[in-house]
From Swiss-Prot:
Recorded name of the encoding gene: POR
Protein name: NADPH--cytochrome P450 reductase
GO MF annotations, alphabetized: flavin adenine dinucleotide binding; FMN binding; NADP binding; NADPH-hemoprotein reductase activity
EC number in record: 1.6.2.4
Domain Flavodoxin-like: 80-224
Function as written in the Swiss-Prot or TrEMBL entry: This enzyme is required for electron transfer from NADP to cytochrome P450 in microsomes. It can also provide electron transfer to heme oxygenase and cytochrome B5.
Organism, as annotated: Bos taurus
Cell location: Endoplasmic reticulum membrane
Entry binding sites for FMN: 86-91, 138-141, 173-182, 208
Amino acid sequence: MADSNMDAGTTTSEMVAEEVSLFSTTDVILFSLIVGVMTYWFLFRKKKEEVPEFTKIQTTTSSVKDRSFVEKMKKTGRNIIVFYGSQTGTAEEFANRLSKDAHRYGMRGMAADPEEYDLADLSSLPEIEKALAIFCMATYGEGDPTDNAQDFYDWLQETDVDLSGVKYAVFALGNKTYEHFNAMGKYVDKRLEQLGAQRIFDLGLGDDDGNLEEDFITWREQFWPAVCEHFGVEATGEESSIRQYELMVHTDMDMAKVYTGEMGRLKSYENQKPPFDAKNPFLAVVTTNRKLNQGTERHLMHLELDISDSKIRYESGDHVAVYPANDSALVNQLGEILGADLDIIMSLNNLDEESNKKHPFPCPTSYRTALTYYLDITNPPRTNVLYELAQYASEPTEHEQLRKMASSSGEGKELYLRWVLEARRHILAILQDYPSLRPPIDHLCELLPRLQARYYSIASSSKVHPNSVHICAVAVEYETKTGRINKGVATSWLRAKEPAGENGGRALVPMYVRKSQFRLPFKATTPVIMVGPGTGVAPFIGFIQERAWLRQQGKEVGETLLYYGCRRSDEDYLYREELAGFHKDGALTQLNVAFSREQPQKVYVQHLLKKDKEHLWKLIHEGGAHIYVCGDARNMARDVQNTFYDIVAEQGAMEHAQAVDYVKKLMTKGRYSLDVWS
């Protein structure tokens, strides 16, 4: 048994050994196969990936080269580049004028949108002989860069690039009624110097509250002699008229390829695709358009735009931008006085084939479309337009007057101020008053600036109205010194936008949302003090709606105070019922209304602020309250700010200078916010 058991055991051991050996061999074979397959797959996969990777690298390289403005300047023989930061088109217009000036000095210039180029390329600019970078930089809102200059601003803040050898000059566009007057232009000028660039002429400060055109002309007439002296060049002659675009008339054009008012992509209004922005606005349906006031002297209105299915998101305090259309009667009058067929399909093509800007507005299109949707025909034209138009005045006196107004002489500046600006003469009025002035319509379309979007503070909260954006506006209409009646382009156009009726017609508004820093505090318990006379109440309707919504959600909400001003309670008390309802429900802690014309002595919002000075100081100093001011920048905002200086000085027992510093620190911390206009 023992032997049998031993034999049996031996046999079992051998069998186990054989099994172990068998599985080990199988494992090795399988492992080898797996490794082989994986290796082959990996190599195969890698090869397959190398093709798109290589293509991607080529694309990136090409893209980088396209964004090199220095390479473009070398290729096209230019040595002056004029960058513009523009929100309303004025800075871009000034940049174009400066780039055209260059030819008078044997130089070649180009205007450039900083958004389209890599500004790190500035360090390579000295590779071009007698190269100069000019910056026409507007300031938007409260010291912010314009949308197209935001990336440039961010780059300047982050970079430490050496700009030694770079020559530059800056002209800033701003408004002195704003707290941060010309902040962007001043920053660019200072920062470029810090990075080693050489300023060849003093910073220019344009003030739109005064005469921006005169500020620019005065700076420009001193700037070019400084450039000549620096580079050792001389002017080649008098300023001459040089066409930038050539006319092409289309006699047999497929209408499907013709622009009919789109801002960017052809047929974008027929085939709407997000995201929606300045170059791709959303066509919103007007669902509500009601008059807010009882009086007949002015028309104040509340509109609601449907943004369902647009994927547009907004927050209380944001702005809505709308693209208006010019009055068809004005357009028709222009066509008649120029003897032009407005329905001709045409294109204006840039004579500079290397330019990024192929057309002054979307082409091909008709003159009617251009004058209705693309060109500004209601603002007084600038001096460069008058200079170019003068050649078409056949009557010597009219020709002389136009050239004089376009000159930099004191007499010319005074005449332009009085005859054009103060009289608010638009292009049609000038053509009517100068009968011999009859320019070709295509040249006029080349000269007129682009019609710009108008911005309105959104008068709703997305928490309550996620599918609609509300606008509060006053229709502008006034008589000029010449007896003409001028109307606001956008507000008159909005006023006529009737909601869909029984006939099924829809009133549409091209729009997009622009983000703002005008925001409610992060903590709902933080008290808010809102000051907004007239249509300045608009963003506060959204703020109050949001605070009311938070209360309905069971959230604890801090004190909400509104200081609102209007003329009379029975004339222009906007959102009267809504505000009374919020006050009754407790969402609005205090509703303080100043009526400026209801009693012999005028009462303004600042008077009501002084009346509540003790409580306001407690909310600000102890409660961490946030202050918001919306409305007129020239008078109201300044007076309100001075009132807060007085309150802080008196209640905080401070000297005036200390009180000013206290309020300025509130601004720096985001506790004193402004949404103002002039």
